[in-house]
Amino acid sequence: MIEIEKVCVDFTAGRGTSTRAVDDVSLHIAAGEIFGIVGTSGAGKSTLLRTLNALTRPSQGRVNVNGVEISALDGKALRQARQRIGIIFQHFNLMHTRTVAQNVAFSLKAAGWERSKIAPRVAEILTLVGLADKANRFPVQLSGGQKQRVGIARAIANHPDVLLCDEPTSALDLETSATILALLRQINAQLGITIVLITHEMNVIKSICDRVAVMSGGKVVESGEVFDVFAHPQHAFTQQLVSHTLNLTLPERLREHLPGQLLKILFIGDSAEQPVLSEVAIKFGVAVNILHGKIEYIGERALGILVVQLTAPHNPTAVAAAVEHIRQRTAQVEVIRG
């Protein structure tokens, strides 16, 4: 569906100097998936997204969408290719002097739809996004979530194959963000549209995406299935993002002053539902103190992470035996302090 091959994007600054915003990025995005690109501000993710509809041209490399090198198109051919690629923005970009229905109809008129087919299509798409009763409202009369729904309706009205989402929830509160993400998931499942979404929030990635690429300094430092990236982050930057998202950082005071061994334990799938800690407490006579932890469900797979303290003042070897038992029953054990 989308092939990004060794793409670099350079921006010229003053006095002939240039800045590399995207640095040698290669990605394959399959048809029908929801693919996330995550990174902090300045990571290059928005610039990379804009190469997918040629709003930004690569300085090097190629971008192919549906077998067509969109980075090489211009004129009429580019306009036709862009009709198959919808885009929604962080700040909605609605026309404030036009109604909801007129905002959606505008994209169809621009694409050359027959006049008689525009109104039925607008009604159909507003029903899909839950705004059938808001067709004659103006943007100023809408909430932030409703404005983003108009943006989504406008972006998918022309039956695109691809929907680009540029930080679609960053201007919304948590509850509204969840409803927008649920709508995007529904659109993906119902219409089969490939979605490419950029965000700085790993929670958004966890909620909606099938696969993810992590960007830092213009490079993709890690990519893979969302569950695998959360369960086994390889790059230091990804580890930092995941740790922050799961909120598993212990206060330094606890790390320094608690006796015994401190472990971070990863449970995957069925192991997240097994009484492993109860087993070691009974079998080895160690005291188990859970300091921090949670179980997340990514897709339909369980991912549990616990930070625990193990102590056995009168039997030092029991702790080592307990740790070994935990290693055999769980996906991963990290000794934070031993």
UniProtKB/Swiss-Prot annotation:
Where does the record say this protein resides?
Cell inner membrane
Provide the catalytic activity annotation: L-methionine(out) + ATP + H2O = L-methionine(in) + ADP + phosphate + H(+); D-methionine(out) + ATP + H2O = D-methionine(in) + ADP + phosphate + H(+)
Against InterPro entries, the record matches this protein to: AAA+_ATPase, ABC_transporter-like_ATP-bd, ABC_transporter-like_CS, ACT-like_dom_sf, MetN_ABC, MetN_ABC_transporter-like, NIL_domain, P-loop_NTPase
What range(s) does the ABC transporter domain occupy? 2-242
Q: Name one GO molecular function term.
A: ATP binding
Q: What is its main location?
A: membrane
Q: What is its EC number?
A: 7.4.2.11
GO CC list: plasma membrane
**Where, in this chain's numbering, is ATP bound?**
39-46
Coiled-coil annotated residue ranges, if any = none
Which UniProt keywords are given for this protein, alphabetically ordered?
Answer: Amino-acid transport, ATP-binding, Cell inner membrane, Cell membrane, Membrane, Nucleotide-binding, Translocase, Transport
Q: What does this protein do?
A: Part of the ABC transporter complex MetNIQ involved in methionine import. Responsible for energy coupling to the transport system.
- Family listed: Belongs to the ABC transporter superfamily. Methionine importer (TC 3.A.1.24) family.
Q: How does it assemble?
A: The complex is composed of two ATP-binding proteins (MetN), two transmembrane proteins (MetI) and a solute-binding protein (MetQ).
Specify the protein name.
Answer: Methionine import ATP-binding protein MetN 2
Q: Which organism is it from?
A: Salmonella choleraesuis (strain SC-B67)
Q: Provide the taxonomic classification.
A: Bacteria, Pseudomonadati, Pseudomonadota, Gammaproteobacteria, Enterobacterales
- Gene this protein is translated from: metN2
